[in-house]
């Protein structure tokens, strides 16, 4: 594990986070056999610890079930920061109302069907987006914030073996269409408020994928590419599933990471740090490490 130099956020800096917390409400038999518990009620304490240690100003969630959202809201009441919730089906937003004022918001789910391809590309309606427009109370700066979770299955290697549960032809195209819908929506909000925007989430797509190239073609820049003080090179991912978990993080290049943070319209040099948080206690909490940026507006 990387030894992290924690730099707290200041009144001049916003800490913006994306976090897939793992949609797992109940314990699994495999964990129970090991005397462990992966239920939401067991894991919420680890999530609260992450937020207590990092103090993000905005958290864009993915795989946040209704139960987990309730548990987090209950837990926040006893924490140093009592985050305010903007509801969204599996993609809620939590924000610091002491620092930020909510100006506007909108939530939506992606279509289940993709023209030209069979099957569902949003089978449990968890693939969605959530937008919040915020005003920074200290200086009046506005920004648009969007969290999203794109379709998860793979497609290029599936052409000759569709029996694999993680394969579905058209999945790459689905992600590109999904993110294109959100980019259009963000254009509307940026046009309305004339301010920077932050787009983040679990994209289920690597840096060089068609979906992520589409984001950059629309003018967004990856925080990793423009951070002036520190840019994380790890992927922030490890094995943590109903069958169990492992106590090591995957050693893969940054380009293969699927949790991304993009910005547009910010001042040059505004993104100071792009990081992932992967402490040892986090192994049984979620397969995705939270990623965050420090941003000056």
Model-predicted segments: where are they?
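N-terminal, active-site-proximal structural segment of metallo-dependent hydrolase catalytic domains
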Residues: 1-74, 297
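Metal-dependent phosphoester-hydrolase catalytic domains
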Residues: 1-4, 187-198, 204-297
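Structured beta-strand-rich core segments of catalytic domains in phosphoester-bond hydrolases
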Residues: 6-8, 58-153, 275
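Short, Asp-centered acidic motifs that coordinate Mg2+ and/or phosphate
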Residues: 14, 57-58, 143, 196-198, ...
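Acidic/histidine-rich helix-loop elements
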Residues: 18-43, 111-123, 151-174
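Active-site metal-binding loops of divalent metal-dependent hydrolases
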Residues: 20-21, 148-150, 202-203, 289
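His/acidic metal-ligating clusters that form di-metal
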Residues: 128-148, 160-203, 208, 212
